[in-house]
Amino acid sequence: MFALCDVNAFYASCETVFRPDLWGKPVVVLSNNDGCVIARNAEAKALGVKMGDPWFKQKDLFRRCGVVCFSSNYELYADMSNRVMSTLEELSPRVEIYSIDEAFCDLTGVRNCRDLTDFGREIRATVLQRTHLTVGVGIAQTKTLAKLANHAAKKWQRQTGGVVDLSNLERQRKLMSALPVDDVWGIGRRISKKLDAMGIKTVLDLADTDIRFIRKHFNVVLERTVRELRGEPCLQLEEFAPTKQEIICSRSFGERITDYPSMRQAICSYAARAAEKLRSEHQYCRFISTFIKTSPFALNEPYYGNSASVKLLTPTQDSRDIINAATRSLDAIWQAGHRYQKAGVMLGDFFSQGVAQLNLFDDNAPRPGSEQLMTVMDTLNAKEGRGTLYFAGQGIQQQWQMKRAMLSPRYTTRSSDLLRVK
C-alpha cells in the first residue's frame, strides 16, 4: 500500500509561508533570469495565468491584477523540501523521494491498525503544522493508482479534504470512469491521442483493455501501467535514488558575455558547483567537459557553440582539479567577438568513494589533504550559506550572474535573512 504526498503549488507556497500578507492573493514564481511562469498558486490559476507565460509580456497585466511575482529562490525551496521529507520519514517506515515536492510512503501494515484516510489526514496535518505547507495525499495499492488518488485529492480538495483512499475497488472504478486517459501518470500527449483514436478515452477504458492488445500496439511500459491500474504492483518503492551517471551545471547568463575573463569566472563557478554536487553524491569523476554557446535566436548575429573535454587518469572530487580541467577546456573553444548566452560544465565517468584507484603515471596525483580541505569548505558553505567560501577564479562582482530581480530572502538558511519579530 502506497501513499503519494505532494505539496500543493510548492514553489509559490514556499514564498507565502513567510509572507502572511500574501495569503489569498495571486502569487507566481518565475524561471531562471525571470523568464516565464513556472509555478502559480490557486488564486493565480483562477485569473487564467498559465505555466510558461513570459514575464515581459504579462508584467503589465500582472500589475493590474495584483499578481505578486518572485524570482526562483532555489535555496529556500530545497530547505523547505528537506523539512517536508524529514517529516514524512518520521511518519512512514520507508519513503521514496520522487521529486522536490512529492514522495511515496510505504503504508504496509498500516491498514491493519489504522483507517487509511485518518492516517492520510494525520500526514497532512503534521506536515502543515511543521512547515505551513499543504500536501495532497493519495492512497492506493500501486504507485500509479496512488498518483491517480493524489490527483483527485488536489482536484476536488473541498470535497475530499485533500486525502483520497483508493484501496476500495468500487471507488477506484468510479474515479477512473470520471477521468480522461491523459490524467494517468506517464501517459503523454502522443500516447493519449493514439489511445483516443482507438476508443480508449477514460482511465477506466484503459484499465479494462486487454493486456495482449496493449502489448501488441504499444510497449511494456504501458502494459505495466495498465497492470498497476488493475491493482497489480509493478513499481516497487525505491528508498535510494539510483547513482547519477553525470552531473551538469549550466545557466543562461543574466547579460550576454563578450569578454574572456567574465566567461572564465562563470566556468570556474559552474565547475565549483558541479564538484560540490559530486562530493554530495560520494563520487569521483574522470571526465570534465565545458560548453559555451550564443543564442540561436539572436537576429543578425552568427551562431557559435562548441564544447571540449578533459579525461583525467586518476578520478578526483577536488574542486581545484575540476576547475583546472574545465578552464583548460574553455581555452580550447573560446572565440572572441561573440555574445555568449549560455555555458556549462559536465562531469562524467564516475567512481564510487573508496573504489577509485590511483595511477602511477598521472602527473596530477591527489593533493595532500584534499579530502579534508573539501570537507571543511563544504561544511562552512552548508552552515553559513553557499558562496561563503569560494575560489578567487569565480570572481567577486559577477555581472553575468542569473537575473533574479524579485528574489525573496533565504529565510531558513541565511542568518542575515531571518525574520524579525517586533
From Swiss-Prot:
Which residues belong to the signal peptide in this entry?
none
Q: Which CDD domains match?
A: PolY_Pol_V_umuC
Which one GO biological process term can you cite for this protein? Answer: DNA damage response
Matching InterPro entries? DNA/RNA_pol_sf (IPR043502), DNA_pol_Y-fam_lit_finger_sf (IPR036775), DNA_pol_Y-fam_little_finger (IPR017961), DNA_polymerase-Y (IPR050116), DUF4113 (IPR025188), PolY_HhH_motif (IPR024728), Rev_trsase/Diguanyl_cyclase (IPR043128), UmuC (IPR001126)
Query: GO cellular component annotations, sorted alphabetically?
Result: cytosol; DNA polymerase V complex; membrane; plasma membrane
The keyword DNA damage is annotated on this UniProt entry: yes
Q: Which GO terms describe its molecular function?
A: ATP-dependent activity, acting on DNA; damaged DNA binding; DNA-directed DNA polymerase activity; single-stranded DNA binding
Domain named UmuC: residues: 2-188
Calcium in keyword set: no
Q: What is known about its induction?
A: Repressed by LexA, induced by DNA damage. Induced 1.5-fold by hydroxyurea.
Q: Which UniProt keywords apply?
A: DNA damage, DNA repair, SOS mutagenesis, SOS response
Q: What does this protein do?
A: Involved in UV protection and mutation. Poorly processive, error-prone DNA polymerase involved in translesion repair. Essential for induced (or SOS) mutagenesis. Able to replicate DNA across DNA lesions (thymine photodimers and abasic sites, translesion synthesis) in the presence of activated RecA; efficiency is maximal in the presence of the beta sliding-clamp and clamp-loading complex of DNA polymerase III plus single-stranded binding protein (SSB). RecA and to a lesser extent the beta clamp-complex may target Pol V to replication complexes stalled at DNA template lesions.
Entry's family note: Belongs to the DNA polymerase type-Y family.
This protein's name:
Protein UmuC
Organism the protein comes from: Escherichia coli (strain K12)
Report which gene this protein is encoded by: umuC
